[in-house]
């Protein structure tokens, strides 16, 4: 799916996010989505991370009320908390960010005890305290929140403006950087260089080979690394197709 982003003035962002929600929640899955925008990619990307975060706009309003007395402190932390959201799956990057965030012991206690910040959605991997701080940052950020619960990303690459939500691989391209006739070529290269993209392609090939039984792209398939796949190919030899 190719989404031309924010076509309807100031209200376009909300409508685009609602349309993206339809894409990622569709059954059977739509596996690839390119967002083509004249907006700054990081703004679009952060709005997506805010919108797809398992909590609703009303729940984020409750969080704002609960932490209103800490607003001045948290407002200063928001840039770090947004960076934490972008790098949540990178242990090295998030560790550096957390060093400054976790210096406030009283805030740690409050984040740990707040039911909305610790709410775990069925089927989502819990990130514990990390997830609580990500949600706290979203609550105090200016980015758009969803009216209804939306799934969290299962993988994020902020440097490439790429993420995976509900087994849909999404990437953001800026219109000033990439011509319309280059989209397919650039996206194809990006999938090839993106580990989870390779697994998406494998899943599509598996579905083509075995059309009965629905989609084969699930969290188990996406968690397999290219290195592990290569190892099993080497060990299985001619029987690799049967192994797959």
Predicted regions located by residue number:
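Extended charged low-complexity segments that act as oligomerization/scaffolding linkers
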Residues: 2-228, 232, 238-239
């Amino acid at each position: 799916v190719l989404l031309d982003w924010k076509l309807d003035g100031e209200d376009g962002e909300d409508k685009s996010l609602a349309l993206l929600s339809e894409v990622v929640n569709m059954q059977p899955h739509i596996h690839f989505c390119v967002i083509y925008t004249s907006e700054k990619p990081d703004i679009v990307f952060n709005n997506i991370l805010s919108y797809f975060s398992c909590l609703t706009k009303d729940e984020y309003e409750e969080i704002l009320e609960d932490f209103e007395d800490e607003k001045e402190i948290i407002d200063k932390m928001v840039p770090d908390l947004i960076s934490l959201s972008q790098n949540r799956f990178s242990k090295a990057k998030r560790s550096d960010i957390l060093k400054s965030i976790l210096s406030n012991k009283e805030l740690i206690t409050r984040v740990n005890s707040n039911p909305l910040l610790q709410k775990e959605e069925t089927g989502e991997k819990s990130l514990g305290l990390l997830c609580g701080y990500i949600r706290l940052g979203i609550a105090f950020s200016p980015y758009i929140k969803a009216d209804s619960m939306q799934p969290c990303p299962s993988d994020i690459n902020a440097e490439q403006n790429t993420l995976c939500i509900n087994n849909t691989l999404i990437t953001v391209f800026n219109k000033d950087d990439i011509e319309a006739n280059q989209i397919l070529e650039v996206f194809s290269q990006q999938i090839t260089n993106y580990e989870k993209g390779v697994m998406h392609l494998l899943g599509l090939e598996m579905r083509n080979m075995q059309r009965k039984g629905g989609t084969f792209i699930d969290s188990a398939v996406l968690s397999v690394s290219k290195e592990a796949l290569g190892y099993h190919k080497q060990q299985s030899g001619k029987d690799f197709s049967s192994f797959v």
